[in-house]
Amino acid sequence: MLEQMHEALQRLRQEQPVVLNITNYVSMDFLANCFLALGASPVMSVSDLELEELIGLSSAVYINIGTLDHLFIQRAYRAVDLAVRQSKPVIFDPAGSGATKIRTEVSHHILSHATIIRGNASEILSFGDVPAKTRGMDSANATHDAKDIAVALASECLCGCAVAVTGSEDFITDGKRHATVELGDPLMSRITGMGCSLTGVLAAFRSVIEDSFEATRLGVEYFSLCGMLARERCEGPGLFKAYFLDELYAADFDRMRRYHNQ
């Protein structure tokens, strides 16, 4: 597994794929820095006027609805339509789906066109008939609560999509293959934008790995291992954020091996 991660990182740093981000304003800076630390080239666009050209240049399109308004919704819908026409993978983070009616409606609209969907348990549950508990952007459900919905979502997808339910443990599926990841550190949940940045990492990995399930699995594991290494170096969230970027960049697989082989 670590060898596959290493190969993916090498490809990212050799190819430096462009990833177009239609994302929220809260985590935009941290997200862009995560892409750069990996070796990818992020574009953080807020203009409809350049969408078609930028999608043509991009290897993947990442959409996150964390700070949506009517202009953002129009831009996201158009980006999805253009990405589908140009056969570009759409990586989707349904931030807050289930918390409000509009977020849930927008998420359902984008869902059917997504190549990878990454959300917490409550967000993924909002796509099924099971009542979800939310605390704004945070989940009040455990990962195992959303596994059946995740499998059903991935199974219904016609384009080989993958679904990741993330939390204290992570579950990844494409409807046929399943993986559970029990890595990471609780301090990661104390920093805004970590989930958004995880989805961005998945977009970067999908830019160089055609198989959506493998891209998602490797991306989740790499992100989680970097969190564990960053936690070794600090006690609180302020320094953790800086050390986490350092670990994304360092790709220290020798240190990762201690956790990955447990």
From Swiss-Prot:
Pathway: Cofactor biosynthesis; thiamine diphosphate biosynthesis; 4-methyl-5-(2-phosphoethyl)-thiazole from 5-(2-hydroxyethyl)-4-methylthiazole: step 1/1
Keywords recorded for this protein, A-Z: ATP-binding, Kinase, Magnesium, Metal-binding, Nucleotide-binding, Thiamine biosynthesis, Transferase
Residues that coordinate or bind ATP: R118, T166
The UniProt record lists the keyword Magnesium: yes
Top-level taxon of origin: Bacteria
GO molecular function: ATP binding; hydroxyethylthiazole kinase activity; magnesium ion binding
EC numbers on record: 2.7.1.50
Cofactor: Mg(2+)
Segments crossing the lipid bilayer: none
Chemical reaction(s) catalysed: 5-(2-hydroxyethyl)-4-methylthiazole + ATP = 4-methyl-5-(2-phosphooxyethyl)-thiazole + ADP + H(+)
Any one GO BP annotation for this protein: thiamine diphosphate biosynthetic process
Sequence positions that bind substrate: M44, G193
Protein function: Catalyzes the phosphorylation of the hydroxyl group of 4-methyl-5-beta-hydroxyethylthiazole (THZ).
Assigned protein family: Belongs to the Thz kinase family.
Name of the protein described by the UniProt record: Hydroxyethylthiazole kinase
Organism: Chlamydia felis (strain Fe/C-56)
